[in-house]
């Protein structure tokens, strides 16, 4: 039973790390990466759909993305959606859409660093909340006399070690992202 709680907490913490990576993908580093446009929604026959469902997004060079719509009629809508996104990008439209990424200024780098730190802090909070939930479940098992106090103490220590491991991983990934951001 305790092992199930440990496995469950590890899986939930792993999902938090995956979510952190998705959050980091939205932070521009100055290099072109298709995931920068993941959050862009395009109007398509009356409903908004993710850009990657109406076009291929690729990297042309280190500072340019290329968006190739599946239908030529979508070029204007995709162009407009990219311009209106909060990414600060100005696409160049022809048969396909080229999206040059502006060079990051020092101020922009600092802003992106703040966003990355915020994402990391949110991940740490989520991990700690998972720990709190699992420790609550363990205490409930103790109250129901399903486990002994020694088992509760050991399980609590194990959960803390798992939590520390994942918090350290978040810090490691944040440090890597910050280093990537500050690289000119």
Swiss-Prot record:
| A GO molecular function held by the record | ribosomal large subunit binding
Looking at the UniProt entry, the stretches that span the membrane are none
Domain of life per record: Bacteria
Return the SUPFAM superfamilies for the record: Ribosome recycling factor, RRF
Task: Return the InterPro entries for the record.
Answer: Ribosome_recyc_fac, Ribosome_recyc_fac_dom, RRF_sf
Name a single GO biological process: cytoplasmic translational termination
> Known Pfam families for this protein?
RRF (PF01765)
Q: Where in the cell is it found?
A: Cytoplasm
Q: What does this protein do?
A: Responsible for the release of ribosomes from messenger RNA at the termination of protein biosynthesis. May increase the efficiency of translation by recycling ribosomes from one round of translation to another.
Q: Which family does it belong to?
A: Belongs to the RRF family.
Protein known as: Ribosome-recycling factor
The record lists the organism as: Acinetobacter baumannii (strain SDF)
Gene name per UniProt: frr
């Amino acid at each position: 039973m305790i092992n199930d709680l440990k496995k469950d907490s590890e899986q939930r913490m792993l999902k938090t790390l995956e979510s952190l990576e998705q959050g980091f993908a939205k932070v521009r580093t100055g290099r072109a990466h298709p995931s920068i446009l993941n959050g862009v929604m395009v109007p398509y026959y009356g409903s908004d759909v993710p850009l990657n469902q109406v076009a291929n997004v690729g990297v042309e060079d280190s500072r340019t993305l290329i968006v190739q719509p599946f239908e030529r009629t979508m070029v204007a809508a995709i162009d407009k959606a990219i311009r209106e996104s909060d990414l600060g990008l100005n696409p160049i439209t022809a048969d396909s859409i080229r999206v040059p990424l502006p060079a990051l200024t020092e101020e922009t780098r600092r802003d992106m660093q703040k966003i990355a730190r915020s994402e990391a802090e949110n991940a740490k909070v989520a991990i700690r909340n998972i720990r709190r939930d699992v420790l609550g479940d363990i205490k409930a098992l103790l109250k129901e006399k399903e486990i002994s106090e020694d088992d509760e103490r050991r399980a609590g220590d194990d959960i803390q070690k798992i939590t520390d491991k994942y918090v350290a991983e978040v810090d490691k990934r944040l440090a890597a992202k910050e280093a990537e951001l500050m690289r000119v």
